[in-house]
Amino acid sequence: MSELALRHDWQRDEIEALFALPMNDLLFKAHSIHRQHFDPNEVQISRLLSIKTGACPEDCKYCPQSARYDTGLEKERLIEIEKVLTEARAAKAAGASRFCMGAAWRNPHERDMPYLKDMVSEVKAMGMETCMTLGMLSESQAKDLADAGLDYYNHNLDTSPEYYGDIITTRTYQDRLNTLDNVRAAGMKVCSGGIVGMGEQASDRAGLLQQLANMAKHPESVPINMLVKVAGTPFENLDDLDPLEFVRTIAVARIVMPLSRVRLSAGREKMTDELQAMCFFAGANSIFYGCKLLTTSNPEENEDMTLFKRLGLHPEQGKAGTVEEDKAVFAKAQAVKDKASQPFYDAAAL
């Protein structure tokens, strides 16, 4: 299927009808589409590093990085470039093909742009794809990052337009769409998805996917996060989402965005191997490697490696070796990381 053949005119009731399909029918449809466009046993691996943690002025009710909530998170300033490069080297040694850098900002300050551009160009020189998530971007900031070599920019829509106001009040839905427009205009690829399990209805999950699938060009990467409830945030006591509803969201995302990478993001640590296997079958074909996603836990690398072996999956760039060979790779990566003089956060959910 070419980009021109993709649909960009999905109606809400069409997507809701997909969500309502019997599970076997939905999974068959999603997996069939997945096999048409991807190696069904290949998974793209990214590593995500928090380059500036905490003290965000926004009021996103799910986020422990907001300065408005008492979550016990220690804020950190923008970290040194050498620490970023140390983590990037370790990520590459561990098999990651993309390195993502996230900062807890409403938007980057102009004084930080030269520093951010250096980060991008230095990581890019290692032969890895680069991604950043820094909040809202102006047209000029997007162009500067693109000129530095940034491949992807992440800016999630989070949920449907109708439910959005119950989640965030300090940034509008249109603000988010404007940033994505600036990213596209600068020539970068878009990474945009959302979070499920925030008390939304099934129609809101349909609404989120409708917004993404009806963009002039589908996001190249679509992260689907399961809410990680953090003490101190307004959402710490929400009821858990039925895991099968998460699988349905993955499957429908695959159907309406056939050429996009659908990423399992935050919440994987709480998922059973069986649930993750269902998600991969439903069309998920990207994950974050590493023990932490920003301030939330992520499966240990060895756990992911073992699961890949059990399911017969392999990273995007070449098939995995034996368990012993993979352990040697991860040991080498850890040795590189240990050279860093200070600990720092690994990542944030995209």
Swiss-Prot record:
**Keywords assigned by UniProt?**
2Fe-2S, 4Fe-4S, Biotin biosynthesis, Iron, Iron-sulfur, Metal-binding, S-adenosyl-L-methionine, Transferase
Asked if the Swiss-Prot or TrEMBL record annotates the protein with the keyword Signal, the reply is no
- Which residue numbers delimit the Radical SAM core domain? 41-265
Top EC class, one word: transferase
Catalytically driven reaction(s): (4R,5S)-dethiobiotin + (sulfur carrier)-SH + 2 reduced [2Fe-2S]-[ferredoxin] + 2 S-adenosyl-L-methionine = (sulfur carrier)-H + biotin + 2 5'-deoxyadenosine + 2 L-methionine + 2 oxidized [2Fe-2S]-[ferredoxin]
Q: What positions does the entry give for [4Fe-4S] cluster binding? A: 56, 60, 63
Q: Which Pfam families match?
A: BATS, Radical_SAM
Pathway(s) it belongs to: Cofactor biosynthesis; biotin biosynthesis; biotin from 7,8-diaminononanoate: step 2/2
- GO BP, one annotated term: biotin biosynthetic process
**What PROSITE patterns does the record tag this protein with?**
RADICAL_SAM (PS51918)
| Similarity-based family | Belongs to the radical SAM superfamily. Biotin synthase family.
Give the quaternary structure.
Homodimer.
The identity of this protein, by name, is: Biotin synthase
Species for this entry? Shewanella loihica (strain ATCC BAA-1088 / PV-4)
Highest classification ranks of the organism = Bacteria, Pseudomonadati, Pseudomonadota, Gammaproteobacteria, Alteromonadales
